[in-house]
Structure formats: C-alpha cells, structure tokens
Amino acid sequence: MLKRQLGTLFLAICLTLTTVPSVLGGENTQTITVTGDGSGDYNCDGVDDHVQINQALEFAAANPGTTVQLKGPFTYDIGGSLLIGSDTTLAGDSGVTIKLAKGLPLWGSRESSIAEKKAMIMIRGGSASNVKIENLTVDGSQSDYYPGIRLGTSSYNMATIINCNGLTIQGVTFQNGCNDALLISKSSNVMIDSVTVNKCGHDGVYAYHVNGITVKNSKFINRTNSSVRFDSVTDGVMKNNECTTSGGGYAGLELQGNLKNIEASGNYFHDLPVPAVIRLNTQETNVNIHDNRIENCG
C-alpha cells in the first residue's frame, strides 16, 4: 500500500512539474525555417524575399521563443524592412546573406528623424524585448545597386533598432552599406559580440541614448565615419575589438553627449586617419580608456 501511495504521489508531482511552464507563462521554444529551395516552412524565390521572412517573423512574434532559421547557402532579396518582435531569434545557416534589393525608393535622408531611418532590420510594433540576430551576412548593396548615394546621408541603414530591451547580435557581418550598420536608440541591455563591419556608409555601431551596451570581439573596417559611436550612453563597454580603415573614415571610438560609466580597453586601433578616440562636446562621469593598442592613427 505504501509503495502504491508513493508511486501515485510521484506521478502527481511529475504531472504538476510538466504543467508549471504553461501556468507561469513560459515560452515554447521552436524553430521554423525559411528556404530558397522549397523545403522550408516558408519558401523564397530570390525576389521580394522580405515578404516570406516577415511572415515567419510574424508567426514568431505570436509564439514567443521561436527561432526563424534562414537556410543556406542562399541570398535573400530584401525590398522592405524585416520586422522582429519580442522573444524572437533571427538566425542564418552558413552562406546566408540578406541583400538590399535594387531599384528601391529612398529610405531615410539627412533630414529624417531616427525613427524615420528605415532599415533592412527593424523592430516590430514600436518596441520589443529579448531579440537575437545571429550568424548571417547583411549586405547593403551600395556598390552594386546604389553607387550614386552619398555615403553618410542617413539613407538605407542596415539595422535601425529603437525601443528594445535585451538585444544580442552575434556572428553577423555587415558589409557594403550606404549608412549605419547598426543604429541603436532608446534601448537597453545590448550585447554585440563577434561582429564584422566592412565598409558601411557611416558608423559601425551608433548607440544614441542607450543604457547598457557592450561591443566586443568585433572587427570594424571604416570608410566614412567611426567604428563605434557612443552618444549619451550609460554603462557602455567597448573591448577587444579591432578598428581600422579601408582608406577613409574617422575614429575607432567616437564619444559624444552625456556619458556615464564608459570603459574602452583591449582594443586594437590602427591606421586610422584621425586619433583612435575622439571626444566631441562630452560631459563625462567615470569614463575609463586604458590598455588599448594604438598604431599609426591620426
């Protein structure tokens, strides 16, 4: 009798534990696939592929914890913003590129506000939390389709992330852009790790009014402005990055505005046309720049 009672109790405990995540509102993790060969949950054909990717991202937004996996090798044609919602991961296989489509009307301008700086990757619905972007190449198509665009005029950003709490970007390459690779504003708890920015059109990482951002283990090849730009940032870290130039550009680290608790260390700045670190109209509290390697700058 005692064994039977213990067995019944054990079964009841197991059943209770299996229901706890749903009771507590836990996420159901799953992966849905987007492909270019017809084998995915959503299938693209190399033209206006943002339509199918956004369908997958819309499903993910309604099902927190979902990963949208872009299968490769394949180049996805992006003629509209990819809109990422909360608790969503956008990830790529090896050989995956999302590439700005040709012949698009102008996205953004020097006169546009940050919120109006339309980009290849943006936040769905005005705000989000716990967003991850991993393991893909973002190609801004500047030399291919938009050679007439003047670099640094706020046109065709690769990513504009506004009002996001909890953002991780890892293993992503941003290349051949017309303006910023990553413009992040009014956001918090941002991690940028092992990213490559190769010849974007303005800043590699532009953080404006951000609370908590780390940029690490990344490589920046400037051609228009700075590798990393902290403007009105609290709790910002830049460490173990390499910053250089393709023949133009500005600083490795550009500091502006009200800055509090900033650290830049372990970085390798070399062959930049100006000083490695530049301050423009800053008001600083606890800004520490130390143990960086600087060669042939400014």
Per-region residue spans from a language model:
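All-beta strand scaffolds that present successive hydrophobic residues in beta-strands
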Residues: 89-93, 128-133, 167-170, 189-193, ...
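Right-handed parallel beta-helix/beta-solenoid
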Residues: 25-55
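Leucine-rich repeat
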Residues: 57, 121-125
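N-terminal extracellular ligand-recognition/capping segment immediately after the signal peptide
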Residues: 64-110, 117, 138
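Secretory targeting signatures
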Residues: 1-26
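Hydrophobic pocket-lining residues that define ligand/cofactor binding sites across diverse proteins
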Residues: 60
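Right-handed parallel beta-helix
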Residues: 104, 126-227
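Short glycine/acidic-rich loop motifs that flank beta-strands on beta-rich extracellular proteins
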Residues: 78-80, 94, 99-104, 142-148, ...
